[in-house]
Amino acid sequence: MYRVAIEKLLKWKQSKRRKPLIIEGARQVGKTWLMKEFGRQSYTDTVYINFDSNSRMAELFASDLDTDRLIMGLELYVGHKIDPNNSLLVFDEVQEVPRALASLKYFYENAPQYHIVCAGSLLGIALHQGTSFPVGKVDFLKLYPLSFKEFLMATGKEQFAALLDSQDFQMITSFKQTYIDALKHYYFVGGMPEAVQSFTENKDFNEVREIQKRILAAYEQDFSKHAPNEIVPRLRMLWNSIPSQLAKENKKFIYGLVREGARAKDYETALLWLSDCGLVHKVSRVNTVGIPLRAYEDLKAFKLFVVDVGLLGCMAGLRQRTLLDGNDLFLEFKGALTEQYVCQQLKTIEDLDVYYYTNDRGSCEIDFVVDTGERIVPVEVKAEVNLRAKSLKTYHEKFAPEVSVRASMADYKKEEWLVNLPLYAIDQIVQI
């Protein structure tokens, strides 16, 4: 299975300023596989330590963090010398041993020749709870579920993925039905690696759904196991409200849908916990535009998306036939799935900040506004071929962006002020 993150890891390996690397991401997005596969491809030796199941290694890091001593202990454990140039040290579930996390500082300062990558299912929570390691001593990489392009490659459509990157939209349009069919499959399967692997091997949508149910059950178990007891009920209510939040025409998160009379302050900790786990994407509102967009963020108004479009469909109880064959009653939630899909793809683009826009009167709403660092791009999302873009026109007249994007099932078309970008090509948004 190809992951774009492998290329990022290769750049990390070759960097003269390389630091120990922490890979962040939700449970089961493929962090362990990625680290092992990177070691297999790029090193002659991989030293893999899982701190959740290895008490001996926990004891090694319990005393002083002298790097020579730690390397000696690791060598004794694996039974051979560790070559700084050819060995990859993999610390998995590193949040289980905070001292191992703290040791990264000393590896960076005293033994930078060693190549170290770390990950953990709930590492984001550990970092925000004050687990000790100095800022500036580590590199970070965020891992998400497979993007649509990675899904194409995983399902044997490597040439179609490469064609998207070529931006030969005349050729792309000739094969649009292939892309549309694959996109429908992606809406159902999503990008969780186990679900994608099952789909590529068996093409069994029922089996995919069972895998997604198991993943969601594991997330719920994490709530009980790792979250503070006092917020667990609120976590569950907030998490389970997301499909109904996104089913609304106005997808702004409303606490009253979580529980009648609910207030923001009652759920702030639960929301932060879900965000730190990587289970949700919080997309905040802006009501004006400038670089950086973050300076205009309205923290009180936001949309909440889940980590994966396939999991959202599973949470909502969508059936295979409804999604793949179409149903008039499904049209409203199809908009929710499409916005979820677009948000998910935008999040996989490095250094892209994602917001949404409404004016103060609420008469103009743009589904997403992205900050590339060089320009602000408004994105209006249409689930079908609908080419109306009233809000986008209003936004364009007010802010005169360099480019405005309508993402829909229609073919690529560049007009005077507007680009219609097919949904299956949304990852090309920075280059157009």
Task: Say what each PLM segment does.
Residues 1-14:
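N-terminal pre-Walker A segment at the start of P-loop NTPase domains
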Residues 31:
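Conserved lysine of the Walker
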Residues 90, 115-121, 142:
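Structural recognition of the conserved hydrophobic beta-strand(s) that form the central parallel beta-sheet
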Residues 346, 366-385, 404:
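Conserved catalytic cores of phosphodiester-cleaving nucleases, focusing on short active-site segments
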Residues 128-247:
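Interdomain motor-coupling "hinge/lid" segment immediately C-terminal to the ATP-binding subdomain
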Residues 200-365, 369-370:
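Accessory nucleic acid-recognition modules appended to NTPase machines
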Residues 53-84:
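Short glycine-rich substrate-engagement loop in P-loop NTPases that contacts/grips substrate
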Residues 34, 38:
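Hydrophobic positions on the alpha1 helix immediately C-terminal to the Walker A/P-loop
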